[in-house]
């Protein structure tokens, strides 16, 4: 499926995407009494109805996705229902209920974890090229209407380490083309490494990534630019908006009159307002947060509160990064949250930080269908999809973490599944 980006404005500003379709509601049916003389006709109608219901149920077991409308990545059977809390509809910026995207076509979004281009990854690029970094996962990234990751390092040759900071990343600029060639449409850069090489390094990174054809969210030349969304147009006409925010910053990283990152803390109302505005411009809103505590597999209360607030404001999918390990998934009011995807392209020294998943989410006006695809990241930071016992171990770990959050993942074959209807 060919994807069209909203490219008429970069981090210096971006115009509106498509308008959201109007609200609709399913019809209600009520059984009517019938006489003995009409029972034969009624029985025939009932049998036909049962046949239609069975056909619909069978079709629902398949997850539509991909740039050409193909099924979700193969590996198992049907999804299962999960828990979720009921609640009111999201409200618009004016305080009225936001219109439901009841007639929007479904879209598929693939989300991946922390991605950087320094240390072991930089050495790998020097030896094998940037495209080889994503060779093990690119087919999944390309299968969706949109794919995105958290870009955890500036991609620049500028060497200007931010003063007072103990860890500085400076990723190989060639990774920008690698991102685009792998099928990644959007990167979030709202994180605690975006300004590792100063404001000049940040602006150079944005320029390089956008020049490669990848949109950037969560950073910009000032606070207004850092809060701008990226918009991806699916070939079926649906529009997907992306926003990125961070709770984890170094002093001076926050965008203001000058370049920096978009922050969710301490004023979450700015995030909620941005989501509500975007919800009236696109069919689906996907939000990324850089948050939580490193190397812990349980979300803190602030993560849960912010994720729920984002969905209450109109987000359809919430993706978390920063802990460098997996945290569980949760269904809230029919929408999917994963609190941390861990690392995707990141060298590491521990088994836990090598375990991750790609989240393949099919969003529709009626709910979400999610497939989790297990990935293992090598010690030098290169990801590959895993099957068999290693893949199942990752899925079982996610299943346990998600159960603690009240959401059940079903494992079938080399994939895990979750499905929920919007509320």
Question: Where do the model's predicted regions map?
Answer:
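Acidic, metal/ion-coordinating pockets
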Residues: 2-34, 38-69, 75-77, 81-423
